[in-house]
């Protein structure tokens, strides 16, 4: 990082000359799913006394704003399982200097929280969904929660809230659904993002696809689609 100025209104610039204006915040390591490429069925959680309190996270965010950060992406684990998440989002959204707050969720608890997220003024919702097949979903996540996630996606459409779907394609597991997920983007006016699996930790046992291969597949079948 070549430039770092702590004065309010200044910005951070990386070594490629790009402005750094967003921060990703993981507010919990806990999750109500057990995706095979992410975490095991049994995983000890970090104790509440060992993680940052929301007040401490907000203090970090205030300092980040003074360095030019205006956008915050809240993730986990599954952020909605942490008690007080919605109050935290409200405080972050109303913090002076903050222009955008989005949340990434697996969608299991989303429908019940959607009206509150709208009231908070959340700027975007990213939903992690790797398959449209309930049986494959249960196999991948070790949980039978597909209907709750799908209902949440439908609910976001009714609310007109900006929604994106994050999908990890794995060879031999859900890769045959590639174009079904493309059609989901078309039919529901959603942004679908295919994320490369990280070959670390529990992801080492799975084979994914690289970005170039996926872009070529889309461009070949749908030359008029906008892909990036």
State the predicted function of each range.
Residues 1-24, 30-34, 219-226:
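Flexible, acidic/Gly-rich N-terminal and inter-domain linker regions that tether
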Residues 27, 46, 78-82, 170-173, ...:
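Short, small-residue-enriched loops and turns at beta-alpha junctions
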Residues 27, 117, 192:
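Residue-level signature of catalytic and energy-coupling elements of molecular machines
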Residues 187, 191-228:
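A C-terminal junction/extension of Radical SAM enzymes
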Residues 15-54, 67:
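Canonical Radical SAM [4Fe-4S] cluster-binding loop centered on the CxxxCxxC motif
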Residues 51-74, 81-189:
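Radical SAM/AdoMet-radical enzyme domain recognition
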